């Protein structure tokens, strides 16, 4: 389909809390939306993408988890599509560095739940429960935050906020 422009930090749509979508209403255009999200995420080498990062107001996110690939073969990914996702359970705590396609060049240590349970619809409109830990848990939390109008830097240590703001000002000069 199409590689879309990535919405950047400071654009209003990134701060909108997206409402759940009606799957039956969405279904006729879902394949095209998912293909655009897939193509865009792969083009920018992202691990995940929310619909509002390409300017859409649908409560949809997509995540790519690297699979074990035999040596010499191209990297393969397991794709997760979550529609109307809600985190229903969180356990543990882990700190790791995060970045975002909407804030290119910025990496910040962020604290997240170590494992989560998410209720959502899959791309066929069926209800699913995802039990996630590790990178998948982190990526789901990051993308669901986007759908809730939050950005990963909202979770940063408050002492780092002035430094993050300064770095964002510098980086944003290079964003197109």
Swiss-Prot record:
The protein's name in its UniProt record: Peptide deformylase
Entry EC no(s): 3.5.1.88
A Pfam family matched in the record: Pep_deformylase
GO biological process, one term: co-translational protein modification
Cofactor binding remark: Binds 1 Fe(2+) ion.
Family stated for the protein in its record: Belongs to the polypeptide deformylase family.
Parts forming coiled coils: none
Reactions mediated catalytically: N-terminal N-formyl-L-methionyl-[peptide] + H2O = N-terminal L-methionyl-[peptide] + formate
Residues the record lists as binding Fe cation: 100, 142, 146
Keywords per UniProt: Hydrolase, Iron, Metal-binding, Protein biosynthesis
Cofactor needs: Fe(2+)
Function: Removes the formyl group from the N-terminal Met of newly synthesized proteins. Requires at least a dipeptide for an efficient rate of reaction. N-terminal L-methionine is a prerequisite for activity but the enzyme has broad specificity at other positions.
Molecular function GO terms recorded: metal ion binding; peptide deformylase activity
Primary enzyme class: hydrolase
């Amino acid at each position: 389909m199409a590689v879309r422009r990535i919405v950047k930090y400071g654009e209003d749509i990134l701060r909108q809390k997206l409402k759940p979508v009606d799957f039956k209403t969405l279904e006729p255009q879902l394949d095209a939306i998912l293909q655009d999200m897939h193509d865009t995420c792969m083009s920018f080498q992202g691990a995940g993408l929310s619909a509002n990062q390409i300017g859409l107001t649908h409560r949809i996110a997509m995540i790519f988890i690297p699979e074990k690939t035999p040596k010499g073969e191209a990297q393969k990914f397991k794709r997760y599509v979550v529609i109307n996702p809600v985190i229903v359970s969180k356990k543990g705590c882990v700190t790791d560095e995060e970045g975002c396609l909407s804030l290119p060049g910025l990496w910040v240590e962020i604290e997240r739940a170590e494992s989560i349970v998410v209720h959502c619809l899959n791309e066929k409109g069926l209800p699913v429960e995802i039990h996630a830990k590790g990178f998948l848990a982190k990526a789901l939390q990051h993308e669901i935050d986007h759908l809730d109008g939050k950005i990963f830097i909202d979770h940063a240590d408050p002492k780092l906020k002035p430094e993050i703001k300064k770095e964002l000002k510098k980086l944003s000069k290079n964003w197109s």
